[in-house]
Amino acid sequence: MAVNFPSIDPAQLHPVAGVTLGWAEANIRKPNRKDVLVVSVEEGATVSGVFTENRFCAAPVTVCREHLAKVRAGGAGIRALVVNTGNANAGTGEPGLAHARETCAELARLAGIAPGQVLPFSTGVILEPLPIERLKAGLPAALANRAAANWHDAAQAIMTTDTLPKAASRQVMIDGHTITLTGISKGAGMIKPNMATMLGFLAFDAKVAQPVLDALVKDVADRSFNCITIDGDTSTNDSFILIASGKASLPQIASTDSPAYAALREAVTSVAQALAQLIVRDGEGATKFITVTVEGGKSAAECRQIAYAIGHSPLVKTAFYASDPNLGRILAAIGYAGVADLDVGKIDLYLDDVLVAKAGGRNPAYLEEDGQRVMKQSEIAVRVLLGRGDAQATIWTCDLSHDYVSINADYRS
């Protein structure tokens, strides 16, 4: 079940000028469910993305990279995105690449744009051929359904093992101009940094130069979707896309050194973090949402390395599920994180406000009932103080329950 998942009111998902979304039921894997999404962006928008680091990347990821490379080389801008659920089109070889390109070509034909102006995305079962004819047959309905206010339907259309649609929206003022940001995400399992079995699409109406948007998407991903983990697996299809429609009155942001860029980065990061945290809250079988913060490191990289050792540990995660304050498991994870010169004699460990370990050993004042009180909460903060510098890092994770096994054992049935 989802952990303290916020209620999402479709009416509070602000339309983004220059962006429309439409969906269809194409029976990609199961009948009577939204499983195709088309996102159209008006001419003049800029689009950028980051993708999985899994070497066995899916066919649509390869095609997305190709099309964005052509844009960066001066080609025509991206005008549409197409997403299917139920089938990952991964591990499908040359036929899979042909299907991804055929999807782009068909949507381009219907929309009156070039195939290279389409980005394809797939999510679902790996190693099965994409039912391309069903997907193509669903495109006209998705195009006909397009509307600026369809963000909630769009969030439903990209779900797989998700139990709830994930969306976030906000409006901010930058240099006296209103900027609207709205995004959707999906993902519930195989969540690990770089990036997760996740798709994330975030649009805003600021006008941003292509090189600046390329920098922004990497920066934002590193502060959001690369800070979550559920089971430590990295997917073949991870994709995070930013769309800058350019319809707001704010002058174009052409430099990463400008105050406007800093303000936009803060706003985009806040929405992306909300979308990333929704994925963890809806993690497969999750019953607890856990924030792991490591402070006092020599670098943010080593802090994140230790945080992920804690967040990935099945022993730590099952202890949280059982509300068992077997917190030595956290110390063990810190120790095997791979920070070679770590002085464990300087480490303090907190569970919420409870000091569990001090100077590398059990705090004499620590009572197990205090630890168990925190472990029974649905939201828990783990804080590690390394005592070797000023850097810090935070990740978000969840516990590991019996339901996680059941969901994944039954996924293809």
From Swiss-Prot:
Site keyed Cleavage: positions: A196, T197
EC number(s) stated in the UniProt entry for this protein: 2.3.1.35, 2.3.1.1
Active site, per annotation: T197
Disulphide linkage map: none
Listed InterPro entries: Arg_biosynth_ArgJ, ArgJ-like_dom_sf, ArgJ_beta_C
Pathway stated in the Swiss-Prot or TrEMBL entry: Amino-acid biosynthesis; L-arginine biosynthesis; L-ornithine and N-acetyl-L-glutamate from L-glutamate and N(2)-acetyl-L-ornithine (cyclic): step 1/1; Amino-acid biosynthesis; L-arginine biosynthesis; N(2)-acetyl-L-ornithine from L-glutamate: step 1/4
GO cellular component: cytoplasm
Pfam name, any one: ArgJ
Catalytic activity annotation: N(2)-acetyl-L-ornithine + L-glutamate = N-acetyl-L-glutamate + L-ornithine; L-glutamate + acetyl-CoA = N-acetyl-L-glutamate + CoA + H(+)
Subcellular location: Cytoplasm
Residues marked Involved in the stabilization of negative charge on the oxyanion by the formation of the oxyanion hole (site): T123, G124
Alphabetical UniProt keywords: Acyltransferase, Amino-acid biosynthesis, Arginine biosynthesis, Autocatalytic cleavage, Cytoplasm, Multifunctional enzyme, Transferase
Record GO biological process: L-arginine biosynthetic process; ornithine biosynthetic process
Main enzyme class: transferase
Organism domain of life: Bacteria
Binding site for substrate: T160, K186, T197, E284, N408, S413
MF-aspect GO terms: glutamate N-acetyltransferase activity; L-glutamate N-acetyltransferase activity
Function: Catalyzes two activities which are involved in the cyclic version of arginine biosynthesis: the synthesis of N-acetylglutamate from glutamate and acetyl-CoA as the acetyl donor, and of ornithine by transacetylation between N(2)-acetylornithine and glutamate.
Similarity comment: family membership: Belongs to the ArgJ family.
Subunit structure: Heterotetramer of two alpha and two beta chains.
Protein known as: Arginine biosynthesis bifunctional protein ArgJ
